[in-house]
Amino acid sequence: MCIRDRNIGFNNTEFLEGSIEKLDELDKDLNPLIADKSVDIILSNCVLNLVSPESRSNLLRNIKRVLNDNGRIAISDIVSNKKVPLRLQNDHDLWTGCISGAWYEPDFISDFKELGFKNLEFAERSAEPWKVIEDIEFRTVTLVGNI
């Protein structure tokens, strides 16, 4: 356990460096970065919108894979009221500003639900949009649920 882990007062906490898109990437001993069913809770703050749409299904499968049987999620991210068009998705300034990769709000819950997550709800959802671009509303939400 690293010093940082001990300093926060928990003995079951570990900090790992890696890409959320590659939780299943194998190390030199052929072990994934994070083992199956080894995580109690996944907390994420504005990370998933930075994952390309092509990589999202793998990302979600890995989130489910690493959570234990009582695992929970609390994911704060940016969603949109309309699907973000490809020309905006390809705008690097909007991508780094957490806009281009915003999840279409109805898909955000349904994509987790399709993988078997339960008790999904928005613990928080901003009433007012954070940004509006080309008549697309972008807002913050916090999705909670469990396996």
Residue ranges and their predicted role:
Residues 1-3:
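Short, small-residue-biased leader/transition segments that mark boundaries at the very start
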